[in-house]
Every structure is written in structure tokens, then in C-alpha cells.
């Protein structure tokens, strides 16, 4: 494969992509059944009988919905009571004639018409805690489906975007992100295009800053700067209130840090200096998560879960690639955590994913090409509580 294809915005690479896209479209659209298949798929995607997929936040259920009347989609919410009452079957097994009562928050078709932009939905983060819980959200929108998007803060009480002039959080178009940084909604974690030298070769921002309302990105404290040749830098605050910083040296590896509350950070003035350096710069108070760079580590409750892509020998025990292991987070950070194997692959079964509920860890497995779920109930190390 020619090296010039690695140039994400290179004219030669983009021309090559356009040429091959056109050839592929011609081949696919020229088949005899193309129109029939497209019509059948559109009917399925636009069906009103679909079960709305919901996400819970601050006591409400949120859903993004598209259909023939709303091709770009509606972002809406409802209550548990309304959603359950209109389910296919009630608890007693009887059919329900009720209809879920949805509150439309954003109509992307209307928004696009009013602003003259074809907005494509890239997701939203509802504030889950504090006095503004369920009343503010950070919404990501892409112009025409581009990889780049913008973030805008919306007042969910009024459905109105809060302009920066009124203190609303806002991010210009980039492959970056904004994420809530505290319980009150007064600060955000900002990963933004800050101009020359701030983007990686892959086009992702290299720097994470924490901003207060009214601050520009240049004024925010610096939490992390990825190395010049890394894929980029990322940050998020989990539902237990912990702040995580991440770099990806390449597509297959990552480095992870926990930033404790009140930990020392770097002043705004260090930003340009850090961007000019070749190596990674991280806040002095951040704690590195010492796992293989090929692994994926995440914290659930007060446990650290580590998904392995390569064999890992710890304390004389080798955990094979494909395993999911865990340790109490506090003990692991102190160098004392003994790893527990939660899942070890076999000749027929491997782990495809996992998710945490309020009290259980649900593993999704594929065993002899058959999906299966396994529910684990780990002991708790402490009183860490999640947000809904």
C-alpha cells in the first residue's frame, strides 16, 4: 500500500478515495436488485414498530429517532412510566394499547432548515448531577455527516441552544470533544483544534484542557498533551465522578491516566510549550494505569477491568489474550491489587463485550457462533455510587 494513503487530508489520497468510492457505487447500484433491497431496508429503518432504544440520565429516558417524516431525526425523552406502559407486553403478559408520550428536545430537520445546514446527529451528554441535572446537555452535531463535528450546550427546559456570549459551552468543528467535568456543570473537559501544531497526523486534537464557563480554550488548565506522532488525546468523566485521560500512540495501543479530584494540573501558559515538544506531557497529579499498552482498561464501580489483546504475565500467572481480568482500583493503584480472571477464552468461546448495571457486570460471549450472556456480581471495595 503506498505511503501517501496515510496523508489523511492529502489531495492524492482523497482523489484515490473518491475514485474508488465512485467505482464501488456504480458496481453496487448497477445490480438488478439494488432498488428493491434499498426500498426494503428503508421500510425497516423507518418502521414505526421499532422498539425505541433509550439511554437513562437524571431520571429520564432519552432516544434519538428517525423515520420517513424525520429523516435527520428527533432527539426526545420520556419517563420510565410512559415507556414501560407502552411496551409490547405489560407485566402480566397482556398487550398494551398505550402510546409513549415523548417530549421532543431537538428536531434536526427543523434545525437544519432554520440554520441552512444539514445537521447529522453525533450524540449528546445529559448532565446527570447537581442543580442542573436533566436540564443541560452537550450536543454533538456534524455538518453533512463529516468526521468533524461541533458541540453546543442546550437548555433542555426551553430547547434553546445557549450561545457563548451567555456563558454556554461551545466547540468549533474538529475531531475533538467536550465532556462535563464536574457535578455542577460549571466546567468541561475540552479536546479542541487550537491551531497550528495542535492536531495529530490523524487529524485529532493532541491536548486536553479543563475550562470554566466563559473561558476560551487558551485559558483552560492543561491536563494532557499527546506526543506529536500519537493519534491523539482524549478525556472523559465516568459516571462515578472520576476523570480519565487517554492517549493513543497508534490505532492498537493506548496509555491511560486517572486524574484525582484536586490533583495538580498545568497552567494555561504551558499549552503552547507542550505542543512544541515531541513527547507526552501529563498533569503532575495524574496517576498512570500500569497495564499493557495493547490492553483496554476501564473502571466500573470501584474495580478496574482490563481486557487483554496479548498474553500478560503478572505475579507468575499468565493471563492469555482475550481474557478479562479485574482488581480493586485503589489496591491496583497502590501496586497491591491481585488480578482476578473474570473471563478466559476457550477454543470455542470468546468475549465480545461487557456492560455494568447498578449491581452486576454482564458479559456478552460468542460460544460456537451462538450469543450468550453471563452475569457476574462482584463484591464492593467501597461506597462508590454511580449516577443514573
Please report, for each region that a protein language model flagged, where it lies by residue.
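Peripheral, non-catalytic segments that deliver or gate enzyme domains
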Residues: 2-32, 37-42, 47-60, 64-82, ...
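Short mixed-charge
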Residues: 82-98
Amino acid at each position: 500500500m503506498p505511503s501517501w494513503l496515510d496523508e489523511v487530508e492529502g489531495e492524492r489520497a482523497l482523489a484515490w478515495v473518491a475514485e474508488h468510492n465512485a467505482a464501488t457505487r456504480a458496481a453496487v447500484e448497477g445490480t438488478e436488485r439494488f432498488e428493491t433491497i434499498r426500498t426494503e431496508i428503508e421500510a425497516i429503518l423507518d418502521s414505526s414498530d421499532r422498539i425505541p432504544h433509550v439511554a437513562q440520565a437524571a431520571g429520564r429516558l432519552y432516544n434519538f429517532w428517525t423515520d420517513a417524516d424525520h429523516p435527520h431525526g428527533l432527539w426526545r425523552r420520556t419517563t420510565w412510566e410512559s415507556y414501560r406502559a407502552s411496551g409490547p407486553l405489560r407485566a402480566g403478559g397482556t398487550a398494551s394499547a398505550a402510546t409513549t408520550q415523548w417530549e421532543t428536545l431537538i428536531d434536526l430537520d427543523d434545525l437544519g432548515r432554520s440554520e441552512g445546514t444539514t445537521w447529522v446527529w453525533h450524540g449528546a451528554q445529559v448532565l446527570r448531577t447537581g442543580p442542573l441535572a436533566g436540564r443541560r446537555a452537550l450536543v454533538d452535531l456534524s455538518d453533512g455527516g463529516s468526521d468533524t463535528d461541533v458541540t453546543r450546550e442546550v437548555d433542555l427546559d426551553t430547547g434553546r441552544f445557549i450561545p457563548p456570549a451567555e456563558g454556554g459551552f461551545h466547540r468549533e468543528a474538529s475531531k475533538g470533544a467536550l465532556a462535563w467535568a464536574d457535578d455542577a456543570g460549571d466546567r468541561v473537559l475540552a479536546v479542541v483544534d487550537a491551531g497550528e501544531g495542535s492536531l495529530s497526523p490523524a487529524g485529532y486534537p493532541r491536548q486536553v484542557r479543563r475550562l470554566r464557563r466563559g473561558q476560551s480554550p487558551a485559558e483552560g488548565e492543561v491536563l494532557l498533551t499527546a506526543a506529536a506522532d500519537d493519534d491523539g488525546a482524549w478525556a472523559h468523566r465516568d459516571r462515578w465522578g472520576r476523570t480519565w485521560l487517554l492517549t493513543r500512540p497508534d490505532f492498537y495501543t493506548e496509555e491511560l491516566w486517572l486524574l484525582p479530584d484536586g490533583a495538580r494540573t498545568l497552567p494555561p501558559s504551558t499549552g503552547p510549550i507542550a505542543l512544541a515538544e515531541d513527547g507526552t506531557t501529563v498533569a503532575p497529579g495524574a496517576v498512570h494505569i500500569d497495564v499493557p499498552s495493547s490492553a483496554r482498561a476501564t473502571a466500573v464501580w470501584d474495580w478496574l477491568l482490563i481486557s487483554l489483546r496479548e498474553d500478560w504475565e503478572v505475579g507468575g500467572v499468565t493471563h492469555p489474550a482475550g481474557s478479562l481480568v479485574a482488581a480493586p482500583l485503589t489496591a491496583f493503584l497502590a501496586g497491591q491489587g491481585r488480578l482476578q480472571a473474570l473471563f478466559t477464552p476457550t477454543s470455542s468461546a470468546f468475549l465480545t463485550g461487557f456492560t455494568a448495571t447498578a449491581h452486576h457486570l454482564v458479559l456478552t460471549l460468542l460460544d460456537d457462533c451462538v450469543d450468550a450472556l453471563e452475569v457476574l456480581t462482584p463484591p464492593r471495595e467501597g461506597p462508590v455510587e454511580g449516577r443514573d
